[in-house]
A protein has these predicted regions:
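Active-site loop-to-helix "anion-binding N-cap" substructures in soluble metabolic enzymes
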Residues: 1-232, 238-303
Length: 303
């Protein structure tokens, strides 16, 4: 079946189901193009919490769909591919976090939204790459912060505020593929281009950036920047949106190796099957949800 026919069927079923299609910036181009909303984790969370749709089709990875389920317990949350997980989210478990909390009993727990619902249930407040510094600054009543699971985002935040951080040894396998030599090579090839990087990158990579931004921050910055050329250091899926929204500018990936395999599992065919068969449903248990929503709600309250 060709793409236009698939899109037609998806749109018809979406209307019948009263569904909304939420798509992360790293998804393949064809999936981004059918979205009701394309964005980063923070924007997706806010859109999910505000929707009046009966069905949320989440084209991303599992923790994102879980967050939607936490925020919208009365909605049906579907993932087109049940195997679309996040390796970094899997690097920390609720059991490991509880042990860390015992070790640092005076610390507040700041969890990246890239975590399981069970980890969020053990968390004081969540953050995304777009608001991590603001969230950490909002924790006025503590000098100690446990940050899980991304050690590189934690390091970046720790350079911006004066607190005692305890890092977990987690990382994004996609962003660690971005190396200093990749940036230097691209800067040599495109000397007029500005370098914009994601805070999940290594510190030695971050040091070479003109701007350090979340994916949504990158999209906003690209529209405002006077630069006609931008070197982008994050998962390459975002290039589609950047180019679509800024047709008069040129965008170059730091490296073509920055691909998240699980983000690429979702296809138009799977979105169609998802709406036809109403699977795979992601449902966080009420016991976990009522604990986890406190941390997620606190994140959404910080502007």
């Amino acid at each position: 079946m060709n793409n236009s026919r698939l899109v037609e069927k998806i749109q018809r079923l979406k209307k019948q189901r009263n569904a909304i299609i939420l798509v992360h910036n790293y998804q393949i181009a064809e999936v981004q193009d059918i979205a009701d909303y394309v964005g980063d984790s923070l924007g997706l969370s806010r859109t999910a919490s505000a929707t009046d749709a009966d069905v949320i089709v989440f084209c991303g990875v599992r923790f994102m769909a879980e967050t939607a389920s936490i925020l919208c317990p009365d909605r049906i949350v579907l993932m087109p591919d049940i195997n679309a997980g996040c390796p970094m989210a899997d690097m920390i478990t609720a059991e490991k976090l509880r042990a860390l909390k015992k070790e640092h009993s005076r610390a507040k727990v700041l969890s990246y939204v890239n975590t399981s619902a069970e980890v969020k249930a053990e968390t004081d407040i969540c953050c995304t790459s777009g608001n991590a510094v603001f969230i950490a600054e909002s924790l006025k009543d503590t000098e100690e912060i446990i940050f899980v699971p991304d050690k590189y985002l934690a390091h970046y935040v720790s350079t911006k505020i004066n607190r005692n951080f305890f890092f977990w040894d987690g990382y994004c396998p996609t962003h660690v593929k971005i190396l200093p030599e990749d940036i230097l090579r691209q800067k040599k090839t495109h000397p007029k281009a500005e370098v914009v990087l994601h805070p999940e990158c290594r510190p030695e990579v971050i040091a070479l950036a003109a701007q350090v931004l979340s994916t949504e921050g990158m999209c906003k910055y690209a529209k405002q920047s006077n630069s006609a050329e931008i070197i982008v250091g994050t998962e390459i899926g975002i290039l589609h949106r950047l180019q679509r929204e800024n047709p008069d500018k040129k965008f170059y990936p730091v490296t073509e190796l920055a691909i998240c395999p699980t983000m690429k599992l979702t296809t138009l065919e799977k979105v169609l099957w998802c709406l036809e068969d109403m699977k795979y449903e992601i449902k966080v248990t009420e016991e976990i949800r009522v604990k986890a929503i406190r941390a997620v709600d606190k994140m959404l309250e910080v502007r």
